[in-house]
C-alpha cells in the first residue's frame, strides 16, 4: 500500500506508525485513495483514508481503533485512523 507521510517525530512515533500501517494493510479492505499521514497539533498521528462506502469506512475505523489502543498502551504514541467515504 502506498502512503503519503508528512510529519517529523521520534523513532518511537515512526515505529508506532509503521506498526499501525502494517495492521491497516492486513486487517481492512484497501482504501480507494492513498492514505495520508499527518501529525496533529495535539500530537496525535492521523492516518486519513478514503473508503468506497460509509459502511466500509465505519468498519475500518472500528477495527483500527482496537489496534490504536494496543499501540498507545505499548508505546504511549497515539495513531488513529480518520476514515471517510469517497
Where are these regions (language model features)?
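Short edge beta-strands and adjacent turn/loop segments
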Residues: 26-46
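A short amphipathic beta-strand at an alpha->beta junction
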Residues: 69-86
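A short interface-forming secondary-structure element
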Residues: 45-62
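Acidic-basic catalytic patches of nuclease active cores, encompassing PD-(D/E)XK
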Residues: 16-22
Amino acid at each position: 500500500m502506498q502512503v503519503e507521510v508528512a510529519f517529523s517525530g521520534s523513532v518511537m512515533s515512526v515505529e508506532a506508525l509503521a506498526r499501525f500501517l502494517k495492521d491497516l494493510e492486513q486487517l481492512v479492505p484497501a482504501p480507494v485513495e492513498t492514505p495520508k499521514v499527518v501529525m496533529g497539533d495535539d500530537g496525535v498521528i492521523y492516518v486519513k483514508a478514503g473508503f468506497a462506502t460509509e459502511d466500509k469506512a465505519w468498519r475500518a475505523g472500528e477495527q483500527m481503533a482496537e489496534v490504536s489502543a494496543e499501540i498507545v498502551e505499548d508505546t504511549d504514541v497515539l495513531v488513529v485512523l480518520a476514515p471517510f467515504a469517497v
